[in-house]
Structure formats: structure tokens, C-alpha cells
């Protein structure tokens, strides 16, 4: 008994030093963490505003107590060295980078490039390569957090160093695009926007290569300033492109982007101008990338979906079938639709007065919220008397992309009432607009004919949210495929309307209007039925997307109609559409994600510019500050003299790095929950 008791006493004596050592180590660790926290706050307090924003915008601040001041200094020095090698990204000065390596790996992504401009705020970058010159400008408005990206691209028509000679490329099928992409890899531009695409671009004065498929450059020896604006010739019979996508086998692309709307409107008034525009909306601001497309020769392609029962997969609508407009040259068509179209989903059909051509370049729809606009303009005209040779004005294919976050509450009508059919018909001369709203997606298609120029507009409004700065959306993501599906659905509707017009023009006995109306009715019913299957509520969004993705990857045999001129549909994987650049404009969708849950009312964070506009001060240990409070409610730490604080409009104060991180995901005060910028501003932010 005594021996066992002595052994137990000895064991307890052994555990006492171990417990003491454990507590000592824990106390030492806590003390070191406190020292690191103090050094952290001291480092933040000593940073000037520019260095603080630089580290914050690059997510280099870390967590207090887990990172040392030495590591913070190393991070700051590292990012400064990185920006020193590219001063244009910081101070907005012009930077000629004609000697940038062609295979620069860190500039091969349009997403990465645009992200760089978005992080750095105001910046201007320009460069030249051969006959290519480009200039990219990014601007931020600190008052409202608007971001605008503008890419200006021009081509020197006399310098054809990168142009492909010959006309054989017009016979390459669309399915050979990947092979064509590989064969021409070495001929790409050095612009970071042009990397990872099948595009071969030539640019001149203040331009840049862009992520756009190739189309043939119509160069007939024009001078550099006027080469893109041919005023001679007439429209070639036919239109190139497949459901709003330029064919991969067309040769070259002419680009022109205009930083302001007035400049863009002025250029659109020039006769024979070939233009397209891609507008990126972020935080309620529009950025634009305008693309001018001049085609030398294109095979006639009909932009139409050939199946009677439209597939749920809009990818089936991208391959082109034959589209003829030879009869249009001698007899312009003036059609009106007076009959209501009733279909599932909320649908309205109405006619409106012709609009000025200048308005078509931006928001040519009767709706005020943001939109994705795919516009295909067909120009017709006789040969100019000033032309000594038969130079034709070729079809103009214009793709407009406008994306903006839809404010909470705009899509609350996703109930049974919103899915009922409501039609309306008005009177006008030559404009037809169809609107459908189902499952939160609003799509419109319009047709306008004015002075021999016919414009088809397909508009898609998609509920979006901006993804985090460091998050990259995989091409196989459900959200990106949802956006892709909606875009292709709109392209299919657009092409169906165009073919309806084409077929109606073939009938000169006065029965073309019923045929067109029949096409529009079938279009609305079939597409709306597929949209209804996609899910009319966000609760089924993920399941619907998964089902539709499975359908997108399946190769189905299309149902051909009576016309022998309608070719079969060629299905392609949506991943390849994004990766190979068949739809390069979809890379811009990487900035956005579809709302995959019913959280339209969820309030999101403030922009960096809105956060920076809030007042700051240094904490001082005096009677006034003692009355206001000594503890940051975010990190639950006491204020120390010299701490940099940010004050909200409600007069609550926090550590600047603590509240900035909070406001990046929220727009209310952590204490009183009052909106920091007001409900309207916060929602728009």
C-alpha cells in the first residue's frame, strides 16, 4: 500500500512540471501574438494612404497576430517592385510595350488583364506590334465606385504583314475551328487580350488586339485613317456568322473602340462603318470594347435554328445555316405585325416608332435595366457612282455585350403571374419587339428597318453578381454555362426572326406577314417552353443548370424542316466555346456569376472607392476618445494611441483594416446595422 502510494505521489510530481511547461509555452505564445498584433497595428498606422490601399487591394494585409511586420514590409516591397516594372498600371501613363514577349504567360488571359485594370483603377496602356497599335484605358469614379474599361483598336490597312492572302478560308467548316486555331498560333498579336483565342488581329493607331475571332480584312489600299470606313459598293448577298458568332474561318478583324459615347455615336454615323461593341458593366458602370468588323468575302450563312421544337441547349443554335437576302436589294420590306403572340411566360409584343441609328450602338431596347445585346445589322445599297471598281459593302455583324448587376427587387416577379402570358400590340412602321420574362431571365428580340438598313436586336437580361477579385470562374462552372445558355438562346431567337423575314420576302403575294407571325409565335412558344423547363424559380436553378449541362454535352440529331437549304446543327462543348475563343466575349462573363440561390434581397458590400471615401483619423487617448469608446467591435481589441480608425456616417469607428474588410462584404454598420451609404446607393454599389 505504501509503495503504491509513493508511486502515485511520484507520478503527480512528474506531471506538475509538464503542466507548468505547457502553461508557460501557452503564455509565451500569447505574448508573442500580442507583440505581433502591436507591431501589425503600428505598421498599418505608419502606412500612407497609397501604400495602405495598395496592400489592401492586393489582399496583402493578412491577419493581426498571425503575420509579422517584417513579412508585411516584404509584401509591400514586393508589390512595389512588381508595379515598378509596369509603371503604366499605377500612374496611368502611356506605356509602349511593343517588345513584350509574344508568349508572355502572365498576359495570356483577358480575365487577368481586365482584373489588373480593375485593381489599379485609373490606368492607360498602349502598345504597337507591326501594323498594330492599341490603347487600353481604365477609369474609376471614386464618388460612386463606377469602373469603366475601354479598349481602342485600329488597323493600318496599307500594312498587311499579318494578313492571310487568298479566299480558300471561306470554305473551312466551323468544326475545323480548333485545327485552324492551332495552325495560326504563331501569327497572333502580342496583346494580352488576344492570347488564348483563335483570333488573328491587326491593329493601328491607338488600338489593341482583342479576343475576337478572325474575319477577313477588306483592304483595298485605303489610307490608314479612312480604310475602315469604306463608302463604296453595296451589300454582298448573305451574312456571315453563326447565331451571332463570326465564323472561325473568316480571315481578319478590324477593331475600333471609343472611350466616350459621343465619339462612338459620331463614328457610327459614318457611311459603311463596320462596328461592334462589347460593354462590360461593373458596379453599375459601363465599360466598352468596340469592334469594327469589315469582311472581304463571306460564305452566305443563315442565322437560324433548324429544329421545330427548339432544344434546351442553346449551343445547338450556334452553327450557321444558309441565310439569303438577294431579294432585298431590289425590294425593301416593310412589315408590321399586329397580332398578339400568346405563349407561356410573361410575353409582350408591341410595335414602336423607328429609332435614331445613333441609339442602336448602346441600349437599343425599350428597357432601362442592363442587357446583353446581340445586334446583327444588314446594310443594303447600290454601287456608288464614285466607284470605279465593283467594291461591295459587306454584311455588318455587330455584337454588343452589356452586363450589369441587377438590383435586388427587379426580378421579384418570378411567381405564377410573371409566368402568365401577357401580350400587347401597337402600331408602327417597321419595328417589331418581342419581350419574354421567364425564370428571372428577360429576353427581347427586335427588328428595325430604316433607310435600307435592317437591324436585328436580341437582348438578354441576366441576374448577375460580381465575383470576388481573386476568384476565377472555371469554364465548366454551372453559372458560366447558364450565362452561355442564355446568350445562345437569344442568338437562336435572333436568327429565327431573321429567317422569318427572309422567308416572308420570298413570298410576294402578300402572305408574308402571317408567315412571319407564325415564325414569331413558334419562336416564342418553343423557346419559352424550354425556358420554363429550365426553371421559373431560383430554387431549382442549380438542378436545372445541371440537367441542361448534361443536355448541352449530348449530340442530338436535329429535326430538319421542309427547306433543303437549312443545314444540320453542329453541337459543340460549351467548355470549348470559352477555352478556344469561339465565343471570346464570354471571357468577360468570368467577372460575373449567376445568382444560383434566391438571394436577390441580400445586400452586398461596398466598392473600394466607396470605402475610401469614408473619413479616417488617428486615435488619441484623451477625454473625447475615451467617451466615444476604446474597443474596435470587429476585432474586439482596444484602441491604442496612433491607431488609424475609419468613421462611418453613423459615427461608429473601427480599425481601418477591420472595417474595410467588413465593408467589402457588407454595406451596414456592424454595430447599429444602418446602411453606410443609404439603401439605394448601397444596392447600386
Curated annotation (Swiss-Prot):
Q: Where is the composition biased (Low complexity)?
A: 303-313
Enzyme class of the recorded protein, top EC level:
transferase
- Biased region (Basic and acidic residues) positions are 1-10, 17-29, 88-107
**SMART domains, per database record:** RING (SM00184)
Record's catalysed reaction(s): S-ubiquitinyl-[E2 ubiquitin-conjugating enzyme]-L-cysteine + [acceptor protein]-L-lysine = [E2 ubiquitin-conjugating enzyme]-L-cysteine + N(6)-ubiquitinyl-[acceptor protein]-L-lysine
The pathway where this protein functions is:
Protein modification; protein ubiquitination
Question: Tell me, which GO biological process terms does this entry list?
Answer: axon extension; negative regulation of axon extension; positive regulation of DNA-templated transcription; protein K27-linked ubiquitination; protein K48-linked ubiquitination; protein K6-linked ubiquitination; protein ubiquitination; regulation of androgen receptor signaling pathway
What are the residue ranges of zinc fingers typed RING-type?
632-673
- Tissues expressing the protein: Weakly expressed in peripheral blood, spleen, prostate, testis and ovary. According to a report, it is preferentially expressed in testis and ovary and hardly detected in other tissues.
The enzyme's E.C. designation:
2.3.2.27
Q: Which GO terms describe its cellular component?
A: axon; cytoplasm; intracellular membrane-bounded organelle; nuclear membrane; nucleus; PML body
* GO terms for MF: DNA binding; nuclear androgen receptor binding; ubiquitin protein ligase activity; ubiquitin-protein transferase activity; zinc ion binding
Top-level taxonomic group: Eukaryota
Start-end of Polar residues biased regions: 199-213, 250-264, 286-297, 314-325, 519-528
- Keyword Lyase present in the record's keywords: the answer is no
Q: Which UniProt keywords apply?
A: Cell projection, Cytoplasm, Metal-binding, Nucleus, Transferase, Ubl conjugation pathway, Zinc, Zinc-finger
**So which disease is it linked with?**
Esophageal cancer: A malignancy of the esophagus. The most common types are esophageal squamous cell carcinoma and adenocarcinoma. Cancer of the esophagus remains a devastating disease because it is usually not detected until it has progressed to an advanced incurable stage.
> Function of this protein?
E3 ubiquitin-protein ligase mediating 'Lys-48'-linked polyubiquitination of LIMK1 and its subsequent targeting to the proteasome for degradation. Negatively regulates axonal outgrowth through regulation of the LIMK1 turnover. Mediates 'Lys-6' and 'Lys-27'-linked polyubiquitination of AR/androgen receptor thereby modulating its transcriptional activity. May also bind DNA and function as a transcriptional regulator. Mediates polyubiquitination of QKI in macrophages, leading to its degradation.
Instruction: Report the sequence similarity comment from the record.
Output: Belongs to the RNF12 family.
In its UniProt entry, what is this protein called? E3 ubiquitin-protein ligase RNF6
Q: Which organism is it from?
A: Homo sapiens
Organismal lineage: Eukaryota, Metazoa, Chordata, Craniata, Vertebrata
Q: Which gene encodes it?
A: RNF6
